[in-house]
Amino acid sequence: MEGSKLLPCVHKSPVPTSHQLYINYEILGLTKLKKHKYTQNKMSSSDSSSAESRLATAKTVLTTAASVAATAMLARSLVQDYLPDEVHHYISYGFRSIFGYFSSQMTIIIEEFEGFAHNEVFEAAEAYLATKISPSNKRIKVSKHEKENNYNVTVERDEEVVDTYNGVKFQWILHCRHVESKHFHNPRDLNSTLRSEVRSFELNFHKKFKDVALESYLPFMVKRATLMKQEKKTLKIFTLSPENMYGNYSDAWTSVTLDHPSTFKTLAMDSDVKTSVMEDLDKFVKRRDFYKRVGKAWKRGYLLYGPPGTGKSSLIAAMANHLNFDIYDLELTAVNNNSELRRLLIATANRSILIVEDIDCSLELKDRTSDEPPRESDDIEDPRYKKVTLSGLLNFIDGLWSSCGDERIIIFTTNYKEKLDAALLRPGRMDMHIHMSYCTPSTFKALALNYLEIKEHRLFSKIEEGIEATEVTPAEVAEQLMRNDSVDKVLEGLIEFLKVKKIENEQDKAKTEKQELENKKKTKEGTDSVVKKEVDEQLVRNDRVDKVLEGLVELLKAKKIEDDQDKAKHEEVEQH
């Protein structure tokens, strides 16, 4: 139509019915469901593929690790079997250096021994860590001697103990390894040669706390351990164990608990001598700085001499109880040579008493100045079969080796002081000589107080008179005081015993004098025969009479000098 505008043609869809809407919604739902299932299947396929990938990766890692481990084991075996020890150590050091460069930890190794001597830090750590054992530790060592009151708890090997000091964590591990000796078989172990245990502690901490560990923590631990050991210390007496002589020398000393009841309060000896000994001991243990200032080794020597039964062993036990020192009983005949003696003595601990009983009988100590030719046994080349010499013993008592230890007491005992070499007796070796005499009235009163619990009795005066007139030992008097529970009967029996003992003394004295006269007579006869033989030899030495007579005069002069020297020496011994 003219003048009319053309409008765009718009297609209008028919309005869907409700049935058509339902079908469309159903189709749409099925489509979404298919899409959801497709997505799930795709994700499931992806997860399965990822798991397989991870499993393959794990297998690859394990295979690689096994290959590396096998290669490392093979390399280690080749290094140990075919490379010299020097190269082996060099390679090990290189690997440790590489791994240590990237580590923030520092390790301190504390071995049980420093050369021949005990390592004080190791002993302190062993005592200190016993108080740091926690429930996380699975293995510990516990021991107890029959007469000890406390259990000894120590860390078992390869156990880790953690300690915290001023907020810093320190990790301790005990390492042990056994070294077998082929020189000696231990009769207590039928399956192996003698085993010697080498022990060490490993201390780990962050390397930035190095100064704290060395300058503060370790000194604190040593001081704390020393106090702990003194508080719970049980006295011990050590003796040599021959079957352990060829391992560590500390293992050669075996100990038992020392439960000796002797004290200075109960000790029956002269009261003045007892007081003097106690004061000397107390002064010795308090003078550490003094010995250091004057340049002397911190040690003290005592010589106990006197007849058997006068209380030498009881005095040693009283000294140990007074100072709380362990005792090392050294049997010199069990030691093969000077080197072995030196190592055994160095293995003894500080704050201890070393005793050599009956030193005049325990070993033939040859005088260093003697011109006596060596015996056949002295020419044996193997040093293990050469005996201890006087020189070797003296070198440890006051030589350079005497400074290898602190707060030590050395005690020699003998029944016959005059038999000892003078070199053993001088100050610096045996500083104090203590004469353990026969029983005196004061000794008897001490015994009566200990055994009978009495201070006075009407029979004391008679007993004291008998004791002054008789050579009787405190041990013999003590035996009489134990004969009866009745005080009167005991003291009356002691009076009768002293009478019998006095008669025995007189008989022994007469017998001794008779023996001395016979010995002098034999000596004179032997001297006369020697002189006659020497004169005969002198007379045939020359054809000229004047030369013979001159030689004879010189011989007689020399013999007179020898006789004078022998006489002076005999008088000196008698006077002593």
Swiss-Prot record:
Give the EC number(s) listed in the UniProt record: 3.6.1.-
Induction remarks? Accumulates in response to flg22, thus being a FLARE (flagellin rapidly elicited gene). Up-regulated by the Yariv phenylglycoside (beta-D-Glc)(3). Expressed during hypersensitive response (HR) mediated by the bacterial pathogen Xanthomonas campestris pv. campestris. Slightly induced by the virulent pathogen Erwinia carotovora subsp. carotovora. Triggered by benzothiadiazole S-methylester (BTH). Accumulates in the presence of 2,4,6-trinitrotoluene (TNT).
**What are the start and end residues of every segment in region (Disordered)?**
508-532
Q: Which domain of life is it from?
A: Eukaryota
**Record has Magnesium as a keyword:** yes
Keywords (alphabetical) are: ATP-binding, Hydrolase, Hypersensitive response, Magnesium, Membrane, Nucleotide-binding, Plant defense, Transmembrane, Transmembrane helix
Q: Which GO terms describe its molecular function?
A: ATP binding; ATP hydrolysis activity; identical protein binding
**TM ranges:** 55-75
| List of residues binding ATP | G306, P307, P308, G309, T310, G311, K312, S313
Name any cofactors this protein relies on: Mg(2+)
Q: Where in the cell is it found?
A: Membrane
Gene Ontology cellular component list: mitochondrial envelope; mitochondrial outer membrane; mitochondrion
Per the record, membrane topology reads: Single-pass membrane protein
Q: Which family does it belong to?
A: Belongs to the AAA ATPase family. BCS1 subfamily.
Q: How does it assemble?
A: Binds to the Yariv phenylglycoside (beta-D-Glc)(3).
What name is this protein filed under?
A: Protein HYPER-SENSITIVITY-RELATED 4
Task: List the source organism.
Answer: Arabidopsis thaliana (Mouse-ear cress)
